[in-house]
Structures are given as C-alpha cells and as structure tokens.
C-alpha cells in the first residue's frame, strides 16, 4: 500500500531519491511524481497536493523480502531530513 512521509521539501527529497537510484534504474519517468523501474522492482514517489507529504508505492515481482528491503531503504532516504529531529516525525501509516 501507499506509505506517507512528512517532508519539509518534497522536490528536494524526490531529487535525493532519484540521485541515489539513477545509475541502477532501467527507466525513469516523472509524469505522476517520480517513477523508477529496475529489473525486479519499481517505485513511485509523488507529492500530495494538499499536505507536505510524499506518497510512496513500491512493487516487486512477487519477492516479499525484496519488497521489505527496498521499502525500508527508500524510507531511510526519504525520512533522512527528520532523523535528528523530534518534531515533525514521518508518518508511517498507509493512506486511506
């Protein structure tokens, strides 16, 4: 499901994620946020239009462990700006 993260600067956070994965990506599109595809997995990261949130969707080709690994990896990159702060914690609940 979709995972929301509170971020101060959605555009910069998307750019940071893109820089991290760009060399390994098979394709990159920016039609609805940032979508990157790899051999066994892909993700879409898009900004909310109404809140300071990024919404993350990660998919794999049936590899549950890879799904968990890549989701955790992406969330560490996305939420990096909040790692030293106690206020404005990232939201880890799925979107309704």
Task: State the predicted function of each range.
Residues 1-57, 62-96:
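Phosphate-binding and adjacent anionic-ligand microenvironments
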């Amino acid at each position: 499901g979709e995972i929301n993260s509170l971020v101060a600067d959605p555009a910069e956070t998307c750019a940071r994620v893109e820089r991290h994965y760009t060399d390994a990506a098979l394709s990159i599109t920016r039609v609805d946020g940032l979508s990157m595809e790899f051999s066994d997995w892909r993700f879409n990261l898009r900004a909310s239009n109404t809140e300071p949130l990024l919404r993350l969707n990660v998919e794999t080709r049936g590899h549950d462990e890879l799904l968990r690994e890549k989701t955790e990896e992406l969330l560490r990159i996305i939420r990096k700006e909040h790692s030293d702060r106690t206020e404005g914690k990232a939201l880890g609940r799925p979107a309704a």
